[in-house]
């Protein structure tokens, strides 16, 4: 059971002052982590209701690992933590933006960002180095 009220219909969802996340059919919501200082997009992950609630309560980015089927506190094992500075939802509340203070690399490859490859003319080029 989710700790959040259900989403509203139509434009009422766009204008409500209440947090009413719209989780998908798997109970998940997209979560984008962005560096609060630079604005760089760091990663895309997923949250279920429990992960979102824990993030709100603790100020530490907590995600849902689809591969492990378990909660994942960013940096719990790697030390590469995300302190949440600001938390936002998009217009219809089906995506979350976490503005974070990142310690260490955000990517499991030890890069600052998971978005370290640029597509140019259908070819990938690397933009970031692993630590």
Swiss-Prot record:
EC supergroup of this enzyme: hydrolase
Residues annotated as binding Zn(2+): 91, 107, 114
Biological processes per GO annotation: L-histidine biosynthetic process
Gene Ontology cellular-component annotations: cytoplasm
UniProt cofactor(s): Mg(2+); Zn(2+)
EC code(s) of this entry: 3.5.4.19
Example GO molecular function: magnesium ion binding
Chief localisation class: cytoplasm
Keyword line: Amino-acid biosynthesis, Cytoplasm, Histidine biosynthesis, Hydrolase, Magnesium, Metal-binding, Zinc
Domain of life: Bacteria
Pathway: Amino-acid biosynthesis; L-histidine biosynthesis; L-histidine from 5-phospho-alpha-D-ribose 1-diphosphate: step 3/9
InterPro entries referenced in this protein's UniProt entry, alphabetically: PRA-CH (IPR026660), PRib_AMP_CycHydrolase_dom (IPR002496), PRib_AMP_CycHydrolase_sf (IPR038019)
Compartments, as annotated in UniProt: Cytoplasm
Catalytic activity of the protein: 1-(5-phospho-beta-D-ribosyl)-5'-AMP + H2O = 1-(5-phospho-beta-D-ribosyl)-5-[(5-phospho-beta-D-ribosylamino)methylideneamino]imidazole-4-carboxamide
Cofactor note: Binds 1 Mg(2+) ion per subunit. Binds 1 zinc ion per subunit.
Keyword NAD: no
Binding annotation for Mg(2+): 90, 92, 94
Entry function: Catalyzes the hydrolysis of the adenine ring of phosphoribosyl-AMP.
PANTHER family in the record: HISTIDINE BIOSYNTHESIS BIFUNCTIONAL PROTEIN (PTHR42945), HISTIDINE BIOSYNTHESIS BIFUNCTIONAL PROTEIN HIS7 (PTHR42945:SF1)
Family per similarity comment: Belongs to the PRA-CH family.
Subunit structure: Homodimer.
Protein name as annotated: Phosphoribosyl-AMP cyclohydrolase
């Amino acid at each position: 059971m989710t700790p959040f009220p259900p989403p509203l219909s139509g434009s009422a969802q766009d204008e409500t002052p209440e947090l009413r996340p719209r989780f998908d059919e798997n109970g998940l919501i997209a979560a984008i982590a962005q560096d609060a200082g630079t604005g760089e997009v760091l990663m895309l992950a997923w949250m279920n209701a429990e992960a979102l609630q824990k993030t709100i309560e603790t100020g530490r980015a907590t995600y849902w690992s689809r591969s492990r089927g378990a909660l994942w506190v960013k940096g719990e094992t790697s030390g590469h933590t995300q302190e949440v500075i600001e938390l936002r939802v998009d217009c219809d509340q089906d995506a979350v933006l976490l503005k974070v203070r990142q310690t260490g690399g955000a990517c499991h490859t030890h890069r600052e960002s998971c978005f370290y490859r640029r597509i140019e003319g259908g070819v990938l080029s690397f933009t970031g180095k692993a630590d």
